[in-house]
Swiss-Prot record:
UniProt-annotated binding residues for S-adenosyl-L-methionine: 128
Record-linked Pfam families: Methyltrn_RNA_2 (PF04013)
E.C. number(s) listed in UniProt: 2.1.1.257
Protein keywords: Cytoplasm, Methyltransferase, S-adenosyl-L-methionine, Transferase, tRNA processing
Keyword flag Transcription regulation: no
UniProt subcellular location: Cytoplasm
Deleted gene: phenotype: Deletion leads to the absence of 1-methylpseudouridine at position 54 of tRNA, but does not lead to any obvious phenotype.
Lineage summary: Archaea, Methanobacteriati, Methanobacteriota, Stenosarchaea group, Halobacteria
Name of the molecule in the record: tRNA (pseudouridine(54)-N(1))-methyltransferase
Gene (UniProt): trmY
Family: Belongs to the methyltransferase superfamily. TrmY family.
Annotated GO biological process: tRNA methylation
Length: 198
């Protein structure tokens, strides 16, 4: 299982946003939507062995489960609609118990720390960092959990939690990439067994 946590610092925590303004009025929800699409889409298929956790404003986590996903289309607007539908169910999420909003999409009342702890319980936590080891020098983990931020840096508290939880600290290349591009590169690294199998 490949997992990705993406924290959205300005992401909406209510469904009161326009699907026509996800890059502005919805707190750069477009960044999170691109991450979801990069995590799941192949040319003519969906990666079923992937789970994505979107942390919205450190208040809710929307989980996408690849093996159960339906109605995910490769455009940001329809992905934002799935997130909005999940937020419409937020009152049904009791404690850490999820509320399913559509097949493969659920919402939980969990912030970054709890989401990281839960996802890390059966995964190798990989911190992507510009000062990390080159990814080509690191053996691809069997059940990786990549943790990324939106267009903002991690807060100091998030960075400390991640540093404490990380099993590996790697960099994907000489340049800093957008979160959605990092997901694509991470998939390629795993698909090719560390760039050794094509």
């Amino acid at each position: 299982m490949r997992q990705f946590i993406v924290t959205g610092h300005d992401a909406p925590t209510t469904p009161d946003f326009s699907l026509d303004d996800i890059a502005g009025g919805a707190g750069r929800l477009d960044v999170l939507c691109r991450c979801v699409n990069s995590a799941f889409f192949l040319s003519h298929d969906i990666r079923e062995d992937v789970r994505v956790h979107l942390v919205l404003g450190d208040e809710y986590t929307v989980r996408f489960e690849g093996s159960e996903l339906r109605r995910l289309n490769p455009d940001e607007r329809s992905t934002a609609a799935l997130i909005r539908k999940a937020l419409e169910k937020r009152e049904e999420a009791i404690g850490h118990m999820p509320a399913e909003s559509s097949p493969g999409v659920s919402i939980r009342r969990m912030g970054f720390e709890t989401t990281l702890e839960e996802a890390a319980s059966d995964a190798t936590v990989v911190e992507l960092h510009e000062d990390g080891d080159p990814v080509v020098q690191v053996e691809p983990p069997e059940n990786p959990l990549f943790v990324l931020s939106d267009h903002h840096d991690f807060t100091d508290e998030e960075a400390e939690l991640l540093a404490a939880a990380a099993d590996e600290r790697v960099r994907l290349g000489p340049e800093i990439l957008h979160a959605d591009h990092s997901i694509t590169v991470a998939h390629n690294y795993l698909d090719t067994a560390g760039y050794s199998r094509y």
